[in-house]
């Protein structure tokens, strides 16, 4: 309850307040404020939860993309390595084949040269034998000889031995 007076003294206003109504109004206002703060807190909490969830989804998507990239890169490295190994094996096989061919050709050339020298020695021996058989030696000397074939030339050693 309250009484108010004007300074002039003309008007007197008397206000009688019901305490129950005032307390009810105050309680309603406080409840509205609480609801607003609760709703505000809820909105803030909901925003935080939504932000966390969006972040989780983004991280999950990025992780999935990174794993997919890693898998593709690993596959590509493996494929490149297999191709490189295949090329190396093919190059090694070609090299070995060429080396075998060269070695075989060299051995055939060496064999041909040695055979040619052998044929020369054989022809020389035939010539010497033929001349020796045609020659009538009265002392009947013996011939002892040997032949050495080297890579570059041919050596004969013939000894005539008188008994």
UniProtKB/Swiss-Prot annotation:
This protein's record includes keyword Isomerase: no
Alphabetical list of Gene3D superfamilies matching this protein: 1.20.5.190
GO molecular function: calmodulin binding
Keywords: Repeat
Stored InterPro entries: IQ_motif_EF-hand-BS (IPR000048), IQCF (IPR039887)
Highest rank taxon of the organism: Eukaryota
Species of origin: Bos taurus
Protein name: IQ domain-containing protein F2
Domain IQ: 42-71, 98-127
């Amino acid at each position: 309850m309250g009484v108010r007076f004007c300074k002039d003294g003309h008007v007197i206003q008397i206000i009688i307040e019901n305490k129950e109504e005032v307390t009810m109004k105050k309680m309603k206002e406080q409840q509205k404020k609480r609801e607003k703060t609760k709703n505000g807190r809820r909105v803030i909490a909901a925003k935080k939860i939504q932000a966390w969830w969006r972040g989780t989804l983004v991280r999950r998507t990025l992780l999935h993309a990174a794993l997919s990239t890693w898998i593709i890169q690993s596959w590509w490295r493996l494929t490149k390595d297999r191709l490189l190994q295949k090329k190396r094996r093919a190059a090694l096989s070609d090299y070995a084949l060429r080396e075998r061919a060269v070695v075989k050709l060299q051995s055939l050339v060496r064999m041909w040269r040695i055979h040619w020298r052998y044929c020369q020695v054989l022809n020389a021996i035939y010539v010497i034998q033929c001349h020796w058989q045609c020659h009538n030696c009265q002392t009947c000397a013996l011939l002892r000889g040997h032949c050495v074939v080297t890579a570059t030339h041919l050596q004969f050693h013939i000894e005539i031995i008188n008994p």
